Design a protein with these regions (language model features):
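Glycine-aromatic-enriched surface loops/turns that form tight recognition elements
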Residues: 1-89, 93-231, 235-309
């Protein structure tokens, strides 16, 4: 496959086969044979297959609708059998965030693989827990999840396949008995409690809140449970813990207790919205919102992670 950064995509033709030339540039009048036209993209990391938008027709980037009508395109596309598939659906927030490229903005996705995409909001399948009038979108200008009124009109980008990280059941997480938790889906190990907190239910102590630079250093300096390679998670990694079926916090609290209601956590990811870059991403776990905050002016908690190898 091809892709920027750590992304790995394969372009697919209308029948689902891999097109012969993978590094071609999209053209509306192009052909699959010369690699200038494709209908879907397979993410070789997640296994998900994504619909490609077109300037006109059923899959046009101009087609928008309310959340209540979000499944209309999926019904049409399944009848069409796009890319040989008939299980197209609206993606979850977790799934749609997997194609966000936090290394860029406007748009925050891999443009050569996803032509005709817009720096706009796209619906997900998830309602906002605790806010009955709203549903989750992903804003592809900034690459963040947002809560929007269900009556708003936004695009849908369809997905096909299953993604294990969308499940938050106990089988996914293994308590290692030393204050760490292993995620068998992502291959990451997390500290069970935020920095500064300890105990079976993470109720002892007080949460550490620092500016971004201090948080990065605190993570690097940690030797918790005998490991010396702790770090702040990047945006992608932190988002894998957000369970939007819950709120306040949007977490599986049977795995990650949060009795002190610590909600705001730094990530290591920089927000490319200013030059020079002065902001970084954080996750607000009240409902799972992604936000930008000035690195030197905002103090947030740290939730440490390492590669579980």
């Amino acid at each position: 496959g091809t892709g920027v950064a750590a992304f790995d995509y394969t372009k697919l033709g209308s029948d689902g086969s891999e097109i012969p030339v993978q590094n071609g540039t999209w053209s509306e009048s192009g052909t699959e044979a010369d690699g200038t036209h494709w209908s879907c993209v397979r993410d070789n990391v997640t296994g998900l297959v994504w619909e490609i938008k077109t300037p006109t027709g059923t899959h046009s980037f101009n087609n928008k609708g309310s959340w209540q009508n979000r499944n209309t395109l999926a019904d049409t596309t399944n009848a069409e059998g796009l890319c040989g598939l008939t299980n197209w659906r609206v993606p979850s927030l977790t799934e749609l965030l997997t194609i966000v490229n936090n290394g860029r903005q406007n748009p925050a996705f891999d443009v050569p693989r996803f032509p005709n995409g817009k720096s706009q909001s796209y619906w997900t399948s998830n309602p906002v827990s605790g806010v009955g009038t709203n549903a989750w979108t992903v804003n592809f200008f900034a690459g963040i999840g947002n809560s929007k009124a269900k009556t708003s009109n936004f695009q849908v980008r369809l997905v096909s396949g299953d993604y294990a990280a969308s499940q938050f059941d106990a089988a996914r997480f293994v308590d290692n008995g030393d204050g760490t938790v292993s995620d068998v889906v992502t291959g990451l190990m997390w500290k069970r409690c935020p920095e500064g907190l300890s105990g079976e239910d993470c109720s002892n102590g007080s949460a550490s809140t620092l500016v971004w630079g201090g948080s990065m250093k605190a993570a690097r300096d940690s030797t918790y449970a005998g490991y010396d390679d702790w770090r702040l998670p990047n945006m992608k990694e932190m988002q894998t813990l957000v369970d939007v079926t819950k709120n306040n916090p949007a977490l599986n609290t049977s795995v990650f207790p949060n009795p002190n209601n610590v909600l705001n956590y730094w990530t290591s990811s920089l927000a490319k919205k200013t030059s020079p870059v002065t902001q970084s991403y954080r996750i607000n776990f009240q409902r799972g919102l992604s936000e930008f905050k000035v690195r030197t002016g905002s103090q947030n908690a740290q939730w440490l992670v390492r590669d579980d190898i």
